[in-house]
Amino acid sequence: METGFEGATPILRVENLAKSVAFYVEKLGFALDWQTPEVFASVTRGRCTLFLCEKDQGHAGGWVWIGVEDAAALHDDLRAKGVTIRHPPTNYGWAYEMQVEDLDGNVLRMGSEPKKGEAAGEWLDMHGERRTPRPGGGWEPGGSSG
């Protein structure tokens, strides 16, 4: 019997569902799919769906990776809308990626294809510590303070 998976949808814990839905729709460009008042909502942009749950599931400060077509253009758009950019678009081996923070401290890592021929930049970890790429792989503490 085949029990194939159909996909995965991250559930992000939020403190105020109404404010979070407004943020995801107005600032990040998601559409509201459905909402159970004051409890749970589904938002979608393109092929990315996220569930938002008020206080009951998970922990604040979740991380989600979202593939996008153009991280640089999206960065400019989100910055113009006043969205908190935790870390600007930076090249890594897996993607050209930025970190965006929602109203509740959840981090959305949004990335497009890596830039060929460009070295990997520094990384901002979950504690706000900067890391630099280590030759041969991994990360070392340190980096610029800016």
Give residue spans per PLM region.
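Core segments of cupin and vicinal oxygen chelate
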Residues: E2-F5, I11-L50, D56
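A short acidic/small-residue loop/turn micro-motif
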Residues: F40, G93, E113-G117
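Generic preference for hydrophobic
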Residues: L50-L52, V100, M110
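Vicinal oxygen chelate
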Residues: G7-E15, T44, K55-K81, Y96-E101, ...
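N-terminal beta-strand motif that seeds the catalytic metal site of vicinal oxygen chelate
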Residues: M1-V21, G62-V64, S112-G146
